[in-house]
């Protein structure tokens, strides 16, 4: 099987980690161009033997979420529309793929939140992320070959897993050990 990694950040470390494990089922690991999330999704040809792994940071393509991160008012209807657009592009890709794997979005260390009110208010970052993941799940519920992966198991919010220098140098938001989980 061919595994194609698609992201809006650098997944070269994940590729190297997968290749070093010599997984028998994976013949080839390919990383799409850095920062070319939508371009990669739209340009990939039909390959019903390929598994596509799409890992994104929501603030890079869900503009209403990015507004929420900087404490601007958001419109829920636009947020839902943006999530649906993202989901539709993944559903279209699934028609050209064996399987599509999509890690859920999670609250990352650099997100400013509203503390104990984060789940109470509509603008709470934790609440918005949860709502976005639920919306993705609803969009994908009837698509047999799209799988949401619970990324909270990866502990991405821990200081142990982040490295600012790595981000600035290579555009990888996580320590290499995240990719070996």
Identify the function of each model-found stretch.
Residues 1-181:
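Extracellular glycan-modifying ectodomains
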């Amino acid at each position: 099987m061919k595994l194609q990694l698609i992201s809006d950040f650098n997944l070269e470390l994940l590729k190297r980690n997968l290749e070093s494990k010599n997984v028998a089922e994976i013949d080839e690991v390919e990383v799409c161009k850095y920062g070319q999330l939508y371009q990669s999704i739209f340009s990939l040809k039909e390959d019903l033997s390929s598994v596509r792994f799409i890992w994104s940071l929501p603030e890079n393509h869900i503009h209403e979420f990015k507004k929420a991160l900087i404490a601007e008012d958001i419109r829920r209807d636009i947020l839902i529309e943006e999530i649906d657009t993202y989901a539709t592009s993944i559903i279209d890709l699934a028609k050209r793929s064996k399987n599509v794997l999509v890690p859920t979005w999670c609250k990352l260390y650099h997100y400013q939140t509203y503390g104990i009110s984060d789940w109470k208010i509509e603008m709470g970052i934790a609440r918005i992320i949860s709502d976005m993941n639920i919306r993705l799940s609803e969009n994908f519920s009837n698509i047999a070959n799209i799988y949401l992966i619970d990324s909270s198991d990866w502990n991405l919010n821990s200081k142990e897993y982040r490295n600012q220098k790595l981000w600035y140098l290579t555009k990888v938001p996580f320590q290499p050990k995240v990719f070996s989980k």
